[in-house]
């Protein structure tokens, strides 16, 4: 097969591993920077050009689209879909999961457990917003943040009000969530491919750090997940319509709570923690599914 990887940097761990996995399994592989692609939209035959040549003959494409280039990256992916190229994750599913408000609305509509969450832009009554989510302590997030950036734990009502007012000054949309104390600064990353959790790791925040992101000094270790956690992760990925997803769960007194469904989960932490060839599993999934050229949205909404 001829497989394209949409990635801006071929030297990133996840991209390198996917290149290796494609080559090991006998496929032709090419890394494509989506931002450098340009497209013919109006033609009877949709085309993508890159570095002065037409990109043609691809059987499948693996999107590794960074959050900052979601709009153009998914537009390029959509063009590949129009050309009949099989996407490991569909453009509509990526767009859906990148919108934190939309994804949480979809998950809540289907009864998926999640922390009590408030969304706001310019709330008239900050006190009422805090009451609505059960009061302090709360976690306050900028909607556009990734890797733990723009995430603040406010332990008192006064601190929460100050942070919300400061974020409002940035003219940013914000999310206010209950703080799940019993999670102890840890979360579970479930790696879903198709309809299976193929690996899971526990991410523990550094000392004194409530965020468990590995980019912020968190550590990863192998974890055994419960049947309920497995079911929740699979269902969350399915609702988003993602074939490949990293589902982040918190362990709470009322069961697993979904924090986020990531459409471009990193491979380094989870491969190191579990010793599994996850890149190979992604390519194997593509081999089984690309032949049928199925690009119909798996999710609803």
Swiss-Prot record:
It comes from Vibrio cholerae serotype O1 (strain ATCC 39315 / El Tor Inaba N16961). Mg(2+) 2 binds at residues 260, 262. Keywords: ATP-binding, Ligase, Magnesium, Manganese, Metal-binding, Nucleotide-binding, Protein biosynthesis. It comes from the Bacteria. Its EC number is 6.3.2.-. Mn(2+) 2 binds at residues 260, 262. One of its GO terms (molecular function) is ATP binding. PANTHER family: RIBOSOMAL PROTEIN BS6--L-GLUTAMATE LIGASE (PTHR21621:SF7), RIBOSOMAL PROTEIN S6 MODIFICATION PROTEIN (PTHR21621). GO terms for biological process: protein modification process; SOS response; translation. The keyword Cell wall biogenesis/degradation does not apply. This is Probable alpha-L-glutamate ligase.
């Amino acid at each position: 097969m001829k497989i394209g990887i949409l990635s801006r940097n071929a030297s990133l761990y996840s991209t390198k591993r996917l290149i290796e996995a494609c080559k090991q399994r006998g496929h032709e592989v090419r890394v494509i920077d989506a931002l450098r692609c340009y497209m013919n939209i109006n033609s009877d035959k949709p085309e993508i050009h890159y570095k002065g040549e037409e990109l043609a003959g691809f059987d499948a494409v693996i999107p590794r689209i960074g959050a900052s280039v979601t709009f153009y990256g998914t537009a390029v992916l959509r063009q590949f879909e129009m050309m009949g190229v099989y996407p490991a994750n569909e453009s509509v599913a990526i767009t859906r999961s990148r919108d934190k408000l939309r994804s949480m609305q979809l998950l809540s509509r289907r009864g998926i457990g999640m922390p009590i969450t408030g969304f706001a832009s310019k709330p008239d009554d900050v006190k009422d917003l805090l009451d609505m989510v059960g009061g302090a302590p709360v976690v306050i997030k900028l909607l556009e943040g990734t890797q733990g950036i723009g995430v603040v734990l406010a332990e008192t009502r006064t601190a929460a009000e100050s942070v919300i007012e400061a974020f409002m000054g940035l003219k940013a949309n914000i999310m206010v969530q209950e703080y799940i104390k019993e999670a102890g600064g840890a979360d579970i990353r479930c790696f879903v491919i198709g309809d299976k959790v193929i690996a899971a790791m526990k991410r523990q925040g550094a000392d004194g750090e409530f965020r468990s992101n590995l980019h912020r000094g968190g550590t990863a270790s192998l974890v055994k997940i419960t049947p309920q956690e497995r079911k929740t992760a699979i269902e969350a990925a399915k609702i988003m319509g993602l074939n490949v997803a990293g589902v982040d769960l918190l362990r709470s007194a009322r069961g697993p709570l979904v924090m986020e469904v990531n459409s471009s989960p990193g491979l380094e932490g989870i491969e190191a923690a579990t010793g599994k060839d996850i890149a190979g599993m992604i390519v194997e999934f593509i081999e089984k599914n690309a032949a049928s050229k199925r690009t119909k949205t798996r999710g609803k909404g």
